Amino acid sequence: MSTLGAAGAALLTPGKLRASTAMPGAVDGRAASGGGRLALTGLGSTGDIYGELGVTPIINAAGTYTTMGGSLMAPEVMEAMRLGNENFVSIDDLEVAAGKKMAELCRMPEGYTGLVTAGAAAALLVGYAAILTGDNKQYIQQIPDLTGMPKSEVIIQKSHRYPFDHQIRQNGVKLIEVETRDELIAAINPRTAAMHFTNFLNDAGQIKVDEFVKIAQQHNLPAYNDAAADTPPISRLWEYTHMGYDLVTFSGGKDIRGPQAAGLLMGKQDLIRCALLNMSPQEDTIGRASKVGKEEICGMLKALEMFVASDQDAILKEYHAQLDHIGNAVGQIPGVTAQYQYNATAIANVTPRLAVSWDPSKIALTSRQVTQQLAATRPYSIMLAGDGDSKQPPQNPTIWVTAWMMQPGQENVIAERLSEILKSGAKAS
């Protein structure tokens, strides 16, 4: 385990990195003491709640990974959640109102609305439940047992199978795999409930996103597009509903930076109404466990409002500057090269990254060793995507640094620590 130098350690004093973005008032609305924070006793009293719990905080140079907490919410989002906590409210009424606000912000077509769910995976669960049950109370209480129900199959391209189709299958349906347009059409039968499209796998399948929904419309079948990680660009929020997809989902806690336990389900009003019937606060439903609270709903709407109004070009410039700083630092080490990479036409996780490579004849380290040493840094662990690719050719070790979830100032820490690690592996000349 390695610790940062004096400069890096000073920067990472608990709470220091984000002190400039702290809300001026206390979390619960009462007068705050010292620096705009509510004075706590017991847990949280040091300002370093993770340290008190014995958990190592992370500098996230990887991306919006759920395993690391997704993203960090803006102070405005936290304030909206605080306001949502000030009163009791009918959750059903709040969801309906939230859906109307989502429709406005996301420029939905006439007849569409939205629903705040407990994440994108929960949106898959309750969205497909809505397709299967409608508003039939018996069916709602019965699924995932589909005995006696008219629909039990969902068509999906074989190349679009992915870990999150578990949430589709959780409803009891059978996934019917197809590869070609002809196979898709041949697979449609009276038991077909819907057609599923995995948006980030668009290039992997023979049937593309626009053609897929047209086929569904021609056969009067609902089409569901899972676009969970597919913002930015902001326009993705309305692109697929205007294509005609009946249901579309996005993660709330990735680039939109809403609560991590929140997601967005958009779709035709009747389907959204039935999705709400299949989830909390309703009891005896498949979605009861996927509870979303009033605070998450309010925070999610505020985050969405801010995301739609955000200046993505300015944000990209900030990312570029952070990665340039790291690249300039490590690029001075003999044998090391750093290259800025950005694919604006990518479908999912569209964000810049810095590829750092080195000549193994000059630096005797593998990419996995560098990644592991970064992760072992203290007091903050520096996490990259993956653990170093063991399949990389040994003559070209490379790691990737992402600025997406990096906080201001953390580029200095990464530059210092990564330079230290690479220099430690330098071979004597």
Tell me the role of every PLM-derived stretch:
Residues 1-17:
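N-terminal export leaders
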Residues 49, 331-420:
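Conserved C-terminal alpha-helix-loop-beta "cap" of PLP-dependent enzymes
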Residues 56-92, 98:
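Glycine-rich phosphate-binding segment of PLP-dependent enzymes
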Residues 304-328:
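Structural signature of PLP-dependent enzymes
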Residues 3-7, 21-59, 64-68, 99-104, ...:
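Conserved PLP-enzyme active-site core in the AAT-like
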